[in-house]
Amino acid sequence: MSDTQQSAPDIFNTGLVPMVVEQSARGERAYDIFSRLLKERVIFLVGPVEDYQANLLVAQLLFLESENPDKDVHLYINSPGGSVTAGLAIYDTMQFIKPDVATLCVGQAASMGALLLAAGAEGKRHALPNSRMMIHQPLGGFQGQATDIDIHAREILSMRDRLNTILAHHTGQDIETIRQDTDRDNFMAAEAAAQYGLIDRVLTSRGASE
C-alpha cells in the first residue's frame, strides 16, 4: 500500500471501452459498458487504487444507495492496491451506506484491493478460482529533514495498526496473527483466502453465488 497519488489513465479516451446499444420505444441509446452495468448495480475497482478512482467509486456507491437503499451493490475487484487514504475513502463509504456491498475478486486483489475485498458484506465476499490475493503492511518512502522523516515514520506505523485492525475485524483473525502475516508480501490463492477469512466462498459458476 502506498499513500502517494497516482494519475488515473483515461480509458474512455483510448477508444477501448465497448459501447452497448439498447432499443426502446424512443429509439436507440448507447451506453459505455461500465455505465450499462452501473444500471445493474455492478461497479468496478480496476487498476491502482488512487484518488480519482476512489472518488468515482464513492460517487457510484452513494448514487446506488439513493436509487435503492435495500438492494445489494456488486463490486468487482482486479487491483494491485495503491493509496491507503484513497482505499480507506472507499472502505468507509462501503461501511457507511445502507445497501450490502458484495465483493468479487477477478484476477487479483492485492494490498488495499485485498482489504476492500474482505470489507464486503458478510457472506457475500467471493473470488473466482484462479484469482489471487495479497496482504502486506503499508509501504512508505520519505525524504527530507530528520524530524519530518520521524513524523512520517510514526504516521505509517499508526496507519499499519489501523489497517491490521480492519483486517482482523473482517477476517476473524486475531490482531497478532494479522501483524505477523502482513509483515511481508503474503500471497494467497482463492481457496487459501477463503480459509483465512478474506473471502467467504470461491465461485466456480454463476449459480454458485445464488
UniProtKB/Swiss-Prot annotation:
Coiled coil listed as a keyword: no
Annotated catalytic residues: S111, H136
Record keyword Isomerase present: no
Its EC number(s): 3.4.21.92
PROSITE patterns, A to Z: CLP_PROTEASE_HIS, CLP_PROTEASE_SER
Keywords annotated in UniProt: Cytoplasm, Hydrolase, Protease, Serine protease
Enzyme class: hydrolase
Cellular component per GO, a single term: endopeptidase Clp complex
Primary site of residence: cytoplasm
GO process annotations (BP): protein quality control for misfolded or incompletely synthesized proteins
GO MF entries: ATP-dependent peptidase activity; ATPase binding; serine-type endopeptidase activity
Cellular compartments annotated: Cytoplasm
Catalytic activity: Hydrolysis of proteins to small peptides in the presence of ATP and magnesium. alpha-casein is the usual test substrate. In the absence of ATP, only oligopeptides shorter than five residues are hydrolyzed (such as succinyl-Leu-Tyr-|-NHMec, and Leu-Tyr-Leu-|-Tyr-Trp, in which cleavage of the -Tyr-|-Leu- and -Tyr-|-Trp bonds also occurs)
HAMAP family: ClpP
Role, per record: Cleaves peptides in various proteins in a process that requires ATP hydrolysis. Has a chymotrypsin-like activity. Plays a major role in the degradation of misfolded proteins.
PANTHER family per record: ATP-DEPENDENT CLP PROTEASE PROTEOLYTIC SUBUNIT
Family in the record: Belongs to the peptidase S14 family.
Subunit annotation: Fourteen ClpP subunits assemble into 2 heptameric rings which stack back to back to give a disk-like structure with a central cavity, resembling the structure of eukaryotic proteasomes.
Protein name in UniProt: ATP-dependent Clp protease proteolytic subunit
